[in-house]
């Protein structure tokens, strides 16, 4: 068990995810894949320079690519090259736009964006949080307005600021909204 981030290799890694302890940029150590979606994987990771846990987002749309023999690189499936390249460019552009918005506490801060292994990654602050879906389920399936209001007002303010800056967030859902340990 990692004393810095709580990572444990006991549970095994998700299929097609990067192997445990893969090193990226000779700096970031890959831990467990916390989730996957149509865009790729989200891992718990460790920044060996700053000695802090981080969250690593890997662009790896499994409908367009697969792991190469080295178990690290993305290999684009035949006929999917244009779609992969367009989506990769969109991932990088959106990540750069979000990284420029640093003054909003309701948005996870992006520390680094890079390309490696024929794909791209973002590195952001690690937050020990739960999804809104889990929070609501744990609360009996409902939230009263006096409970929901302090959770959603920062989100609405952040969305307003993002849209004013020309940045869209197209993936808002109970799975992507997260509640921190302090209840924010």
Indicate where each model-derived feature is located.
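AlphaC helix of the protein kinase catalytic domain
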Residues: 132-143
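Conserved short submotifs of the Hanks-type protein kinase catalytic core
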Residues: 117-131
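Protein kinase glycine-rich loop
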Residues: 31-37
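AlphaC helix of the eukaryotic protein kinase fold
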Residues: 70-100
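Activation segment signature within eukaryotic-like protein kinase domains
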Residues: 151-152
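Conserved N-lobe loop of protein kinases adjacent to the ATP-binding glycine-rich P-loop
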Residues: 46-53, 60-65
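Catalytic-loop of the protein kinase fold
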Residues: 159, 163-180
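Activation-segment/catalytic-loop signature of the eukaryotic protein kinase fold
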Residues: 112-113
């Amino acid at each position: 068990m990692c004393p810095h981030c709580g990572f444990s290799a006991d549970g095994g890694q998700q299929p097609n995810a990067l192997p445990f302890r893969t090193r990226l940029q000779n700096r970031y150590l890959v831990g467990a894949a916390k989730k996957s979606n149509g865009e790729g994987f989200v891992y718990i990771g460790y920044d060996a320079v700053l000695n802090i846990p981080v969250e690593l987002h890997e662009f790896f749309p499994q409908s367009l690519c697969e792991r190469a023999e080295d178990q690290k690189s993305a290999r684009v499936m035949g006929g999917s090259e244009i779609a992969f390249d367009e989506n990769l460019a969109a991932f990088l552009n959106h990540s750069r736009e979000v990284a420029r918005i640093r003054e909003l506490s309701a948005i996870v801060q992006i520390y680094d964006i890079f390309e490696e292994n024929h794909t791209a990654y973002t590195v952001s602050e690690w937050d020990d949080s739960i999804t809104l879906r889990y929070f609501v389920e744990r609360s009996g399936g409902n939230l009263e307005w006096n409970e929901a209001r302090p959770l959603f007002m920062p989100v609405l303010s952040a969305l307003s600021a993002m849209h004013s800056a020309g940045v869209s967030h197209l993936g808002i859902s109970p799975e992507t909204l997260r509640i921190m340990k302090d209840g924010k």
